[in-house]
């Protein structure tokens, strides 16, 4: 079975082609550099980028997979959550392709794609705990099967990737700021140590975001030199430690010793290090599948319907 999958939930335009659970091609187009002047996502602009890029991505995916359109058996697309305008572009494109090819068109939850992404091209190991940490969400799930995914906790305000970008911007880093925070991280300089909230509470990142933005803005107002390494390292360590504490709580609560990590924050080196200390079995997606991509949407479709 050949699956054409489409992902347009935020600013990445992605088209993939799979043969069952095997990825034949996955094209990702992103115009994030053009968003630098705005310091982040502008929904109307990224929706327009999707319109400009989606046919190009499809053409490249077909070329790379050596598959023709008339061989496609199913079309899968991201339908939620995400930016409404971006999702709309992907949905209309997917439904148009499915209608033209006379095949079934199936909506897939973007988060479920991230949850299953560590197992792309392989077989999931159920049950497992899943953390999705990205610019749009920060949630922990108990995954019993591809069709039995239970949300244990989520962020009540900002997502971790979102505060990475906002604090990173204040430190002078381009969007997305996560890679720069990771690059300049020095644990010996992480000397700013706010207290942690009760572990049973839902995630909340707005308070820590505001605390570090206040530190940065205070230095700017006093014309003091901003110690980007100390502030960035302290901010990153606190944010990651907050997640690790929450994971430990649910690990003990449900006696699950396998964890899967999805979303862009999975690329962070300090985070990977701490995860390996906590869980005996951990899975992260390949780097090319750790951010938004259509391969995970096609793979999620396959797992839910095999």
From Swiss-Prot:
Keyword terms of this UniProt record: Acyltransferase, Cytoplasm, Iron, Metal-binding, Transferase, tRNA processing
Record localization: Cytoplasm
GO BP terms in the entry: tRNA threonylcarbamoyladenosine modification
Cofactor comment text: Binds 1 Fe(2+) ion per subunit.
Names of the cofactor(s): Fe(2+)
Binding locations of Fe cation: 110, 114, 292
Protein name as annotated: tRNA N6-adenosine threonylcarbamoyltransferase
Recorded name of the encoding gene: tsaD
């Amino acid at each position: 079975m050949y699956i054409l999958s489409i992902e347009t939930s935020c600013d990445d335009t992605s088209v993939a082609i799979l043969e069952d659970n095997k990825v034949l091609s996955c094209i990702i187009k992103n115009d994030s550099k053009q968003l630098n002047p705005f310091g982040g996502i502008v929904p109307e602009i990224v929706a327009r980028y999707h319109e400009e890029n989606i046919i190009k991505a499809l053409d490249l995916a077909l070329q790379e997979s050596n598959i023709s359109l008339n061989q496609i058996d199913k079309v899968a697309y991201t339908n939620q959550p995400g930016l409404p305008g971006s999702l709309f572009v992907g949905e209309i494109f997917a439904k148009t392709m499915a209608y033209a090819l006379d095949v079934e068109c199936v909506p897939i939850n973007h988060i479920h794609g991230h949850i299953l992404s560590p197992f792309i091209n392989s077989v999931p190991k159920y049950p497992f705990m899943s953390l999705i940490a990205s610019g749009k969400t920060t949630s922990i799930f108990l995954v019993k099967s591809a069709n039995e995914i239970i949300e244990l906790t989520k962020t009540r305000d900002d997502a971790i990737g979102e505060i990475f970008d906002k604090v990173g911007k204040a430190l002078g880093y381009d969007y997305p700021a996560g890679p720069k925070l990771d690059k300049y991280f020095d644990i010996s300089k992480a000397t700013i140590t706010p207290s942690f909230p009760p572990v049973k509470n839902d995630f909340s990142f707005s308070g820590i975001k505001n605390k570090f933005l206040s530190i940065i803005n205070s230095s700017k107002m006093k014309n003091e030199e901003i110690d980007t390494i100390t502030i960035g390292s302290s901010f990153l360590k606190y944010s990651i430690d907050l997640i690790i504490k929450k994971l430990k709580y649910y690990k003990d609560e449900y006696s699950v010793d396998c964890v899967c990590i999805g979303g862009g924050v999975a690329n962070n080196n300090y985070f990977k290090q701490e995860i390996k200390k906590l869980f005996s079995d951990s899975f992260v997606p390949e780097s090319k599948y750790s951010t938004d991509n259509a391969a995970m949407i096609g793979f999620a479709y396959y797992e839910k319907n095999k």
